[in-house]
């Protein structure tokens, strides 16, 4: 019998039971792919991660699973997994070996207290979305106020501008026809905050409370299209799920987006297999 230890981390929040929950398994060397996938189904969170010994010069190898499949990269799994490592050791820079290469995460401390982390994401490929805007609006249950865009950073995103994300009433069957991992709604900044929502019918996720990969891709798109100036964008997601999540996205010309925030470990346990 083997014992596998894990932590549940609420990501993109400093408040327990908010943000996006993540299961992080430590010491996962030798765990086969089938077992990792089965554990991801068992935890039944949007993502579950497994930390293994590094083989390519990083701090650790990071495997990321949804309940349905392994994925090469996602934002909140990277940040939450880094938080678990940073709580255990006074490290300031973590390099995760992922399916998208080495992802660096800068650890932020204040007076020795862990307060946040900031990852440099893969630079997304961004282009126009060849879709019928009115039809997409009907599928979302809210009209678009501009042209959507597609972005890819290991995950494929459809970025959709709307006046008010809270008014969306998505038709998941219709949205699944767009064949992207995330459909990311965003509304113009108000009082310094940009509101977002994410739907992922292809992955069987009705809604996700915090989506770091989509937030980074959106930030890069908004800078590229002149909607925002270089600097930090604070995105608020998960409100409609009663799990508010604050995602900070730093964008600058010629640089990959940097995405960060805080986390909170809310549970620990073990599986005996």
Regions found by a protein language model. Give the residues of each.
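Active-site proximal loop and beta-alpha junction motif in alpha/beta enzyme cores
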Residues: 1-73, 79-273
């Amino acid at each position: 019998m083997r014992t596998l230890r894990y932590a549940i981390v609420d990501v993109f929040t400093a408040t327990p039971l908010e943000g996006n929950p993540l299961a992080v398994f430590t010491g996962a060397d030798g765990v086969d792919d089938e077992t990792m996938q089965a554990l991801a189904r068992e935890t039944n969170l949007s993502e579950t991660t497994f930390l293994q010994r590094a083989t390519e010069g990083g701090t650790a190898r990071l495997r990321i699973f949804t309940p349905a499949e392994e994925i090469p990269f996602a934002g909140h799994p990277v940040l939450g997994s880094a938080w678990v490592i940073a709580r255990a050791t006074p490290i300031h820079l973590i390099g995760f070996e992922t399916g998208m290469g080495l992802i660096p995460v800068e650890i932020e401390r204040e007076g020795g207290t862990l307060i946040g982390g900031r990852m440099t994401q893969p630079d997304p490929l961004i282009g126009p979305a060849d879709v019928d805007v009115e039809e997409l609006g009907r599928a979302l249950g809210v009209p678009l106020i501009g042209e959507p865009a597609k972005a890819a950073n290991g995950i494929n995103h459809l970025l959709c501008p709307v006046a008010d994300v809270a008014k969306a009433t998505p038709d998941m069957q219709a949205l699944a026809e767009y064949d992207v991992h995330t459909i990311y709604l965003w509304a113009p900044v108000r009082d310094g905050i940009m509101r977002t929502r994410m739907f992922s019918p292809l992955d069987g996720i009705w809604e996700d409370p915090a989506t770091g990969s989509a937030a980074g891709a959106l930030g890069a798109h908004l800078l590229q299209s002149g909607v925002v100036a270089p600097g930090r964008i604070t995105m608020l997601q998960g409100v409609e799920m009663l799990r508010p999540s604050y995602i900070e996205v730093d964008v600058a010309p010629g640089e990959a987006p940097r995405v960060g925030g805080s986390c909170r470990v809310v549970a620990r346990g073990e599986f005996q297999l």
